[in-house]
């Protein structure tokens, strides 16, 4: 409804204030991003200049990386293996830390199972970390009993929860790797399982966060691999 008098004036004034605030926030955001880029370039220059000291002193190196993290700059973005900036072991150590952080942040979403492909294409996409780098880094995590590497149809996955996957769960994930989901009828058609066995395995995987259940697809519930859903978000 159109406003008249003082109410209309207040509405117009509020609209102008909102526009001004939005413009100021956008300008500040651009300025902050530009300042961060400049500061990151300066940090790289500093690291190159003092590279020998950084390599020689773990304490100096640790403080430098902590400073980077505290201001929102990922230390991985500063590594340059071609120019021997820091050491290769430091690079893999930082990748390990980031993998652990990613597993912790996504555990409630994927039940503690994440593919190497998702790690590379989604979480490390902007950091120039390849599959070989991930494999070498994650190999360093094998000493931690809660990390395990396994394969499904030739693709590598990382499990970061102490509960091992059962053979039934692995077979269900194999089907999910093809279609993105599984169901009681799919398991019966492909594996010959009875409905009780299928529902028990599927419900347990839902409870552990390995699958998400969807009742909207039709008469039968579908059990989705979370990575197929999150990649569309």
UniProtKB/Swiss-Prot annotation:
MF terms in GO: lipid binding
Key word Cytoplasm present: yes
Keywords annotated in UniProt: Coiled coil, Cytoplasm, Endosome, Membrane, Protein transport, Transport
GO cellular component: ESCRT II complex
Chain segments annotated as coiled-coil in the UniProt record: 23-46
SUPFAM superfamilies: Winged helix' DNA-binding domain (SSF46785)
GO BP terms, alphabetized: ATP export; negative regulation of transcription by RNA polymerase II; protein targeting to vacuole; protein transport to vacuole involved in ubiquitin-dependent protein catabolic process via the multivesicular body sorting pathway; ubiquitin-dependent protein catabolic process via the multivesicular body sorting pathway
Domain of life per record: Eukaryota
Keyword hit for Hydrolase: no
Quaternary structure note: Component of the endosomal sorting complex required for transport II (ESCRT-II), which consists of 2 copies of VPS25, 1 copy of SNF8, and 1 copy of VPS36. The ESCRT-II complex interacts directly with the VPS20 subunit of the ESCRT-III complex.
Additional remark text: Present with 1040 molecules/cell in log phase SD medium.
Protein's name in the database: Vacuolar-sorting protein SNF8
Gene, per the UniProt record: SNF8
